[in-house]
């Protein structure tokens, strides 16, 4: 009996001191570009759009909102600039979402005043700090992690100081082919260079699907 009581007491002590992690997921129109100062990797993402957070720390994600929108009688891809979102972790699971964008008017309104919502699965809204991450130069996504590190060191509204030193510009194993070596793009126009860049960013399965799709376009 004494042994059982001691064992139960030990379990209670451990559960009271160990930080419980919540799971963060996102709406289908959100892509995670960075999670707590690092590029998303297989070790960070449990699935395509989910990862764990500690309930004792503030967390930061950089997201991009992407939607197929109507532009007159046509349809086109809208992609937002990177948005930094900082929020406090919780033991509850969390959903990060963006409003649905269906028209060019919706996209322009969102671009002017972006709003990313962070809520628990029970519907309680979590306070956030958010703003665009300033990007410069050609193919700015290549330097996103370095820009984020500088942002976190700047004391900006959504900055997290502890991530300024932990941000890793270097490759993270398991995140795809492009992270294993230098990315080189060559082409006669920006569209061709962008295709080369995103192809090198993709994992092997995505590259294969893209090649199959491209062959079907001939």
Swiss-Prot record:
Signal peptide positions on this chain: 1-21
Keyword Signal set for record: yes
Keyword Translocase recorded: no
InterPro entries in alphabetical order: UPF0319
Keywords: Signal
Pfam families on file: DUF2057
Family membership: Belongs to the UPF0319 family.
PANTHER family: UPF0319 PROTEIN YCCT (PTHR38108:SF1)
Protein name listed in UniProt: UPF0319 protein PM0395
Organism of this sequence: Pasteurella multocida (strain Pm70)
């Amino acid at each position: 009996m004494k042994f059982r009581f001691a064992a139960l007491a030990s379990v209670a002590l451990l559960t009271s001191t160990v930080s419980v992690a919540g799971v963060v997921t996102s709406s289908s129109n959100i892509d995670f570009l960075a999670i707590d100062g690092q590029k998303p990797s297989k070790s960070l993402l449990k699935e395509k759009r989910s990862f764990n957070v500690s309930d004792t720390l503030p967390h930061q994600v950089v997201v991009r909102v992407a939607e197929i929108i109507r532009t007159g009688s046509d349809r086109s891809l809208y992609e937002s600039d990177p948005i930094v979102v900082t929020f406090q972790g919780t033991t509850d699971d969390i959903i990060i979402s963006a409003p649905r964008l269906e028209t060019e008017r919706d996209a322009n309104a969102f671009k002017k005043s972006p709003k990313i919502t962070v809520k628990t699965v029970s519907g309680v809204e979590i306070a956030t700090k958010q703003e665009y991450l300033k990007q410069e130069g050609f193919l700015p996504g290549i330097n996103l992690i370095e820009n984020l590190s500088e942002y976190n060191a700047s004391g900006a509204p959504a900055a997290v100081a502890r991530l300024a030193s932990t941000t890793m510009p270097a490759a993270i194993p398991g995140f795809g082919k492009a992270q294993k070596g230098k990315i080189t793009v060559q082409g006669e126009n920006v569209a061709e260079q962008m295709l080369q860049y995103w192809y090198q960013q993709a994992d092997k399965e995505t590259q294969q699907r893209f090649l199959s799709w491209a062959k079907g376009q001939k």
